[in-house]
């Protein structure tokens, strides 16, 4: 998997937490990520919540490469929820129009 700036990905941290974020820049020992959100399993299923409660949501955050054990492309439905949570814009999903 090739990671690029502006990709929305899911990181599995060494602590077991999952963070969804948009990659800003990739360095050899760290990534700069925008608006990290944690994926948490709750009574209603998967929920998204801020990863840093006391930080400004719109700031860029440093994530050391030693802090995560896996990274993957975020599922489309979760990606759309992330975009809506961070921008307030609900992405349009592809639909087949029938007559």
Which residue ranges define each predicted feature?
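Conserved RNA-binding domains used in RNP assembly and mRNA/RNA metabolism
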Residues: 2-99
């Amino acid at each position: 998997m090739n990671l690029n700036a502006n990709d929305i990905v899911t990181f599995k941290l060494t602590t077991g937490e999952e963070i969804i974020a948009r990659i800003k820049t990739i360095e050899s020992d760290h990534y700069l990520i925008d608006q990290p959100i944690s994926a948490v399993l709750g009574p209603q299923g998967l929920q998204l919540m801020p990863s840093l409660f006391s930080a400004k949501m719109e700031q860029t955050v440093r994530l050391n490469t030693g802090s995560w054990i896996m990274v993957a492309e975020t599922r489309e439905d979760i990606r759309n929820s992330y975009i809506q949570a961070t921008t307030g814009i609900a992405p349009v999903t592809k639909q087949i129009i029938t007559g």
